[in-house]
């Protein structure tokens, strides 16, 4: 991999007012909401009375292969991983450093490998961080592991291995696995259903769920919704998911949002509510069947929670998610961004204060420019960091707003 600090592409403001999201799910001038009506989005601006920034896109690192997740430390270092194994650090001086770490037990196949990564909120002092990976030992599963990072980012050693185990693994399809912290300090884990039909609705399975765990012990967070239910795994926070790819905490709130893949239709963004069932139920006629023709939110489930946004047809493969936050983003401040794999761009959602969808559009300058977008993440410096997922020739990008 190579560092390319200083290669910058500026995206004109003019593009911001013409790139509305269009898809087969809605008419050419509208966007489907969760209730099925359409609302035109002429611009991804949350605050139209404020200036729309130009976006300066800089390639920080290239020659990567499927970088999956990233996190920025308080010192400005960006830590990132690659799905087939390996951790790296982009240092503030532009140096890229490989982090020595043991991934000898990594299972990497299909959609599963080394996936989610998040720094502990106290990373500056405790140097702790967390990853999620396929595990090749025993019968195989997906596991969350805690690590300690060396002060110079040269090496990382395992602390709690595993912190959480038993996330289902089959062929490598639908492995999840995104990690983020909430405002209480709990570790949230978004999982995939492992393409097994019974998993999403089975409260004894960790597949097709979001989990909420104590990052010190891996035990359930004390007020999890199923801690008193003997028939459920107490780690579970929500269920009825297909393949959670993104988690995003809305600044200034306790609201956590997920982005997940639909089959060939209906990718979703959801506002996570404790104990809620999000309605994915792909059971077939025979045991072991995986029926992907069913709707993402099954109307036969009375309490199924509707998505706040759905792609309709075709699916565009929603992935990592983050909120823009800060005056430097001008009219973009407050937008929920979602990376698009098949859609090859960045979705920009405008939400009201209750989390309801107001409009959907595309962030300018990314449609097909960099291929498949895996992760979008706001850094501690207020800038946007992006990874691509093109099975080679991938990049780590930094996006700077310019008012």
Identify the residue ranges that each predicted region occupies:
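Surface loop/turn motifs at the tips and blade-to-blade linkers of beta-strand repeat domains
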Residues: 59-65, 100-109, 163-170, 228, ...
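C-terminal motif of bacterial Sec signal peptides marking the signal peptidase cleavage site
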Residues: 21-25
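Asp-box/WD-like beta-propeller blade repeats and closely related beta-sheet repeat scaffolds
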Residues: 141-180
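Beta-propeller domain segments
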Residues: 37-50, 81, 112-114, 122-124, ...
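Beta-strand-rich domains and repeat architectures in extracellular enzymes and scaffolds
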Residues: 59-85, 316-323
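Bacterial signal peptide processing site
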Residues: 27-29
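Blade-loop segments of beta-propeller domains
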Residues: 96-121
